[in-house]
């Protein structure tokens, strides 16, 4: 072609040439670009070890094996290219996959992958180099990030400042959740307007009552403050179960769906999980930041299991440690790093279950003033080994006590709330395996050498409950005689206590049954959080009953009793639709309810005093749940509590007056008028007494006499 041809001549010539008649197939074949091997098939990997040239083939082999776990790397030298400089690798490489989808999977699953202690791989698209490396695509100048203004949620424990000291409860009915103050016989007082659509599944308070949680398909939402404002959103798709550490520092969530990183980069930038969480289902959240602290995959034996054991993560009393159970091992983590204790598992062959002591344990030979962290676990019998229950001290992992058991079918561990005692309920069988019975093994954890007291029984114990702040306990048992007809009342309620002296001191380590009630249908024990009073209930599909007992009844107590206990049935109430019951934190009231989650019979709730007197019977269609709001531990020290007990009569009169005002409007007006007149009289006296008295005047002594009339007298025993 003539280089001096003008543009006009060139265009004229182009029109004359018929390109359709020309065959370009040989050129197209020679210079064809395979669309399957575009830039989307490549990833660039940073953070790889810098190795000498002689060791580069070995490093490439290791990395290729890793990347083949998420896709298929192209064979040959084209699959992985690792640049060299000065006889060693430069710390990054290029990987070519067969499809863009494989490259995307590598980014999602291996970005942030820890190769060893010093190297973490950073995997990105090769096209991102062009995107972010081109001039003008990324700002060079630094701009201060925009920090949103601080938003106060108010005092999160404001309900504790209620002048009347009332407890709150949440009522869940239909699609609505409301929070109310308990007003005894009167209708509950709304704290907030009941909210429709508040939760998709259920609502739950945190252990100390600071937060209320709602569960949704997108995750979990926390609420708190005076008006239950939105606090934090925890994104976990299709979450089903939630649990909390004792001090509310952490929350655990579980979903049947594995975590999957979004494909869209914008969505991924705000997604709370990284590539290391891909495929995991169990999440531990930091409550203060709202960010995931650690995620876990489910153990293989739990995948696809319909009835999931819960909780899967168990906590020490102060949130310092948490533990998970796996096949033949316990994984114990230290917070807040959530790294394995000593970087290794605690090997326990065939471990079935474990429990943390719910309080610091003061071992007799320990020099730790704050107390020790103790957990218990048990392992079953095998062909050459007996069943075993053990106590382990953490973090030393030292096993401080074990007992061997034989002919064991099951064990349940019941720690006392103060961490001083552990009862292991051992279900045993005869050699023929046709008959079952129970033994109770009591570990006296704070005594020297941790003695173990055995209580052998003929019945099968299916319910055991310690009394709070006491060594007494209750069992419900049934004789295994082959007749399992549930309509026959064969259950026995047994009340136990240690032997004591005349001054109330424990004189024997043996437990004595001081009361038995036979031929009952009862199957549930629910102690007052303050002790002494207990509800023994029957919860079944066909019938329901609550029996209120006083376990320290003084009037009919035998003079020569060797135990600190005397049982009196205060009242029995039928409640055929009952599905659940719970004490309020003060130990003054009991709520029992019939949930529409179980059936549609008499849905609603009933409120009782601790003596069994029914205060309220409220039928509510589609009623689901009654939830008392927990309280944190009292701030009063021993001296403060002693002062309260000393002035209990004075406080009792004030409470009776407040109750009278609340119960009757006329009484309220009379009491307020009396207070007003008394205040006017005191003001008048103060005004004229200031003028003083004249000289030589007869000095008069004013005697003020106030008479009190007792309208009603009620006696309450405060432990």
Curated annotation (Swiss-Prot):
Biological processes annotated in GO: formation of cytoplasmic translation initiation complex
PROSITE patterns per UniProt: RRM (PS50102)
Keyword Coiled coil among record annotations: yes
Gene Ontology terms, MF aspect: identical protein binding; RNA binding; translation initiation factor activity; translation initiation factor binding
Pfam family, one: RRM_1
GO CC, any one term: cytoplasmic stress granule
Region feature (Sufficient for interaction with HCR1 and TIF32): 1-102
Region span, Sufficient for interaction with PIC8: 1-228
Signal sequence region: none
Primary location group: cytoplasm
Cell compartments where the protein resides: Cytoplasm
Keyword Coiled coil in record: yes
InterPro entries, per database record: EIF3B, eIF3B_RRM, Nucleotide-bd_a/b_plait_sf, RBD_domain_sf, RRM_dom, TIF_beta_prop-like, WD40/YVTN_repeat-like_dom_sf
Domain RRM: 41-128
Swiss-Prot/TrEMBL WD repeat ranges: 194-233, 234-295, 305-343, 346-388, 456-501, 517-559, 573-618
Keywords: Coiled coil, Cytoplasm, Initiation factor, Protein biosynthesis, Repeat, RNA-binding, WD repeat
Similarity comment text for this entry: Belongs to the eIF-3 subunit B family.
Described function: RNA-binding component of the eukaryotic translation initiation factor 3 (eIF-3) complex, which is involved in protein synthesis of a specialized repertoire of mRNAs and, together with other initiation factors, stimulates binding of mRNA and methionyl-tRNAi to the 40S ribosome. The eIF-3 complex specifically targets and initiates translation of a subset of mRNAs involved in cell proliferation.
Summary of subunit composition and partner proteins: Component of the eukaryotic translation initiation factor 3 (eIF-3) complex.
Protein name: Eukaryotic translation initiation factor 3 subunit B
Encoding gene, per UniProt annotation: PRT1
């Amino acid at each position: 072609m003539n280089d001096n041809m003008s543009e006009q001549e060139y265009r004229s010539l182009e029109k004359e040439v018929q390109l359709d008649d020309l065959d370009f197939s040989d050129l197209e074949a020679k210079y064809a670009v395979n669309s399957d091997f575009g830039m989307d098939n490549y990833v660039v990997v940073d953070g790889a070890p810098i190795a000498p040239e002689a060791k580069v083939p070995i490093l490439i082999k290791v990395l290729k094996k890793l990347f083949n776990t998420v896709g298929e790397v192209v064979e040959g030298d084209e699959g992985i290219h690792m640049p060299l400089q000065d006889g060693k690798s430069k710390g990054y490489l290029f990987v070519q996959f067969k499809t863009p989808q494989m490259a995307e999977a590598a980014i999602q699953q291996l970005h942030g992958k820890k190769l060893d202690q010093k190297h973490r791989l950073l995997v990105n698209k090769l096209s991102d180099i062009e995107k972010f490396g081109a001039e003008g695509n990324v700002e060079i100048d630094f701009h201060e990030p925009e920090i949103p203004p601080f938003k106060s949620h108010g005092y999160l424990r404001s309900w504790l400042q209620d002048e009347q000291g009332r407890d709150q409860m949440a009522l869940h009915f239909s699609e609505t959740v409301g929070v109310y103050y308990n007003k005894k016989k009167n209708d509950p007082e709304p704290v907030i307007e009941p909210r429709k659509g508040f939760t998709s599944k259920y609502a739950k308070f945190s252990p100390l009552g600071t937060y209320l949680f709602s569960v949704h398909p997108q995750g979990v939402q926390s609420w708190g403050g005076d008006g239950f404002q939105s606090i934090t959103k925890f994104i976990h798709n299709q979450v089903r179960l939630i649990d909390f550490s004792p001090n509310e520092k952490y929350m655990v969530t579980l979903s049947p769906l594995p975590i999957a990183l979004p494909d869209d980069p914008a969505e991924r930038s705000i997604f709370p999980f990284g590539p290391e969480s891909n495929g995991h289902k169990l999440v531990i959240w930091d409550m203060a930041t709202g960010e995931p602290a650690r995620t876990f995959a489910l153990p293989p034996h739990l995948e696809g299991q319909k009835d999931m054991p819960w909780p899967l993560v168990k906590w020490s009393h102060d949130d310092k440690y948490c533990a998970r159970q796996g096949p033949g091992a316990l994984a114990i983590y230290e917070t807040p790093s959530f790294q394995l204790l000593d970087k290794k598992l605690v090997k326990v062959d065939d471990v079935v279950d474990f429990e943390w002591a719910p309080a610091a344990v003061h071992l007799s030979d320990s020099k730790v003033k704050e107390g020790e962290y103790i957990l218990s676990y048990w392992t079953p019998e095998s062909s050459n080994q007996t069943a075993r229950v053990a106590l382990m001290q953490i973090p030393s992992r030292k096993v401080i006590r074990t007992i061997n058991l034989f002919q064991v079918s099951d064990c349940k561990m019941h720690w006392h709330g103060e961490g001083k005692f552990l009862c292991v309920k051992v279900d045993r069988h005869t050699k023929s395996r046709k008959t079952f019975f129970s033994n109770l093994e009591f570990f006296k954890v704070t005594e020297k050498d941790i003695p173990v007291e055995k209580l052998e029984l003929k019945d099968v114990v299916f319910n055991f409950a310690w009394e709070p702040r006491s060594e007494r306990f209750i069992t419900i048992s049934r004789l295994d005689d082959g007749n399992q007809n549930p309509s026959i009342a064969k259950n026995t309620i047994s009340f136990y206590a240690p032997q004591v002296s005349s001054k109330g001191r424990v004189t024997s380590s043996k437990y004595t049954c001081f009361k038995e009630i036979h031929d009952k249908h009862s199957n549930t024990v629910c102690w007052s959080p303050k002790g002494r009073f207990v509800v023994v209930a029957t919860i079944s599909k066909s019938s329901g009953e609550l029996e209120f007992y006083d376990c320290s009844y003084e009037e009919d107590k035998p003079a020569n009793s060797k135990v600190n206990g005397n049982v009196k049935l205060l009242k029995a109430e039928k409640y055929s639709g009952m599905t659940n019951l719970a004490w309020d934190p003060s130990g003054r009231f009991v709520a029992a309810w019939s949930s529409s989650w179980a059936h549609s019979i008499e849905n609603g709730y009933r409120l009782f005093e601790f003596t069994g007197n029914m205060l309220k019977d409220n039928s509510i269609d589609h009623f689901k749940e009654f939830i008392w709001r927990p309280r944190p531990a009292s701030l009063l020290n021993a001296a403060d509590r002693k002062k309260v007990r000393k002035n209990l009569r004075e406080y009792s009169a004030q409470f009776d007056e407040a109750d009278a005002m609340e119960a009757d409007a006329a009484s309220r007006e009379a009491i307020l008028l009396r207070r007003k007149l008394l205040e006017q009289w005191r003001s008048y006296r103060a005004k004229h007494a200031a003028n003083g008295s004249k000289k030589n005047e007869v000095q008069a002594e004013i005697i003020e006499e106030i008479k009190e009339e007792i309208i009603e007298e009620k006696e309450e025993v405060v432990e």
